[in-house]
């Protein structure tokens, strides 16, 4: 059977469910696919199809994640749901499934619970820009005051982590009742879909962002000059563009005099392309793997930053013992390792395998860095953790 062509007619948005265990994240995911498929087409997915999530690897870490898709009138959504709390933590920190917005599922019967709080904090740390709330299991509550109370609690909680708690849409419903075909609760799923369409702005496409290419290899071609190769992470590079080489050393300005792909000369390379870029007047020894090529003035080199990290458990091949302040592993950014020293938050004595924690890092060499940049923590060539830059300090 020929593969179906992916229809690109609607803008694409990445979302996911977050929230406390057993508050109904997977049931809601099933309800979204099932009920939206009836109206807009697409494949309905049952609870147990979503619940047995396949394993995948991201930055050397195994994560169980379910990916489903659904459509609304105006958009195509890719939606990620994780079976276990640890999978959420790993998923959000590694960026295995980048989210343009999250659906926070909170049971109306229980109100916010510890993981509700933890997932909101994680969303803040890893840069999930928008949260929409689905108050689930509303069929189990018949006290209007309780609804108001839970809603207020959720809004306060969101505000305490710098989300606009007063403005976040909150939809009250029951995913299970919707799946069972209760028309009033099916309507709530459409209401949630409309909230997604309205509240999460269409994300900027990778090609529309400023040009950035992590350098993987450097060659010198006699008579032509220096060529760097790598995959364009974002933006477009044209012949004649003024760019700079950032990271590890002093930032150098240069100009692109040629773009090659599969040994053919092109006028431009764009996000997702593996290209060779010819640099004017740049010496072979001035460039190395681990630096980036970028549009001038769009990214700067830094050595000190705060990050949210997940440390692998022993079972996952992580460390067998905790680490303490002044631990010095390697931090693998894009294409290279840089040694750095870890400082722990006040009151934190040590970090156990399998925990996630906020740290401050000082690198021995600068890296082209911005909030949201992902990295792996490695020791002796093996991954011991993963992290995301939550703020740049210096």
Curated annotation (Swiss-Prot):
> Species name for this entry?
Neisseria gonorrhoeae
Q: Which GO terms describe its cellular component?
A: cytosol
* Annotated family: Belongs to the TRAFAC class translation factor GTPase superfamily. Classic translation factor GTPase family. EF-Tu/EF-1A subfamily.
Q: What CDD domains has UniProt attached to this entry?
A: EF_Tu, EFTU_II, EFTU_III
Write the protein's name: Elongation factor Tu
Q: What are the top taxonomic ranks of the organism?
A: Bacteria, Pseudomonadati, Pseudomonadota, Betaproteobacteria, Neisseriales
Question: Among its keywords, does the record have Oxidoreductase?
Answer: no
* Catalytic activity annotation: GTP + H2O = GDP + phosphate + H(+)
Gene giving rise to this polypeptide: tuf
Q: Which PANTHER family match?
A: ELONGATION FACTOR TU, MITOCHONDRIAL, ELONGATION FACTOR TU-RELATED
Q: Which domain of life is it from?
A: Bacteria
Task: Give a yes or no for keyword GTP-binding in this entry.
Answer: yes
Residue numbers spanned by region G3: 81-84
What does the entry list as the binding residues for Mg(2+)? 26
């Amino acid at each position: 059977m020929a593969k179906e062509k992916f229809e690109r007619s609607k803008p694409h948005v990445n979302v996911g469910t977050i929230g406390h265990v057993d508050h109904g994240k997977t049931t809601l995911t099933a309800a979204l696919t099932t009920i939206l498929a009836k109206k807009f087409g697409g494949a309905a997915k049952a609870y147990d199809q979503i619940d047995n999530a396949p394993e995948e690897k991201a930055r050397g870490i195994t994560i169980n994640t379910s990916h489903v898709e659904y459509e609304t009138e105006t958009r195509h959504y890719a939606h990620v749901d994780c079976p276990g709390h640890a999978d959420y933590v790993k998923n959000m920190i590694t960026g295995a499934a980048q989210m343009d917005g999250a659906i926070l599922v909170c049971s109306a019967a229980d109100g916010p619970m510890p993981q509700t709080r933890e997932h909101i904090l994680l969303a803040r740390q890893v840069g999930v820009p928008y949260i929409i709330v689905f108050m689930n299991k509303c069929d189990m509550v018949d006290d209007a005051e309780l609804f108001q109370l839970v809603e207020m609690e959720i809004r306060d909680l969101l505000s305490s982590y710098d989300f606009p708690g007063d403005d976040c849409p909150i939809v009250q419903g029951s995913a299970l009742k919707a799946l069972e075909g209760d028309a009033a609760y099916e309507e709530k799923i459409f209401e949630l879909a409309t909230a997604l369409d309205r509240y999460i702005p269409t994300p900027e496409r990778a090609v529309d962002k400023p040009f950035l290419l992590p350098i993987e290899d450097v060659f010198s071609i006699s008579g032509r000059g220096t060529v760097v190769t790598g995959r364009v992470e974002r933006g477009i590079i044209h012949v004649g563009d003024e760019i700079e080489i950032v990271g590890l050393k002093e930032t150098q300005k240069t100009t692109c005099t040629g773009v090659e792909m599969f040994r053919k000369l092109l006028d431009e390379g764009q996000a997702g392309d593996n290209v060779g870029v010819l640099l004017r007047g740049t010496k072979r020894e001035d460039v190395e793997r681990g630096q980036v090529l970028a549009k001038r003035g769009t990214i700067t080199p830094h050595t000190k930053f705060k990050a949210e990290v997940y440390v692998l458990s022993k079972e996952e091949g992580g460390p067998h013992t905790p680490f303490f302040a002044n631990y010095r592993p390697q931090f693998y950014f894009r294409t290279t390792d840089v040694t750095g020293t870890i400082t722990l938050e006040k009151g934190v004595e040590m970090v156990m395998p399998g925990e996630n924690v906020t740290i401050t890092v000082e690198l021995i060499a600068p890296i082209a860095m911005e909030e949201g940049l992902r990295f792996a923590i490695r020791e002796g060539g093996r991954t011991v953790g993963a992290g995301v830059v939550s703020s740049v300090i210096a």
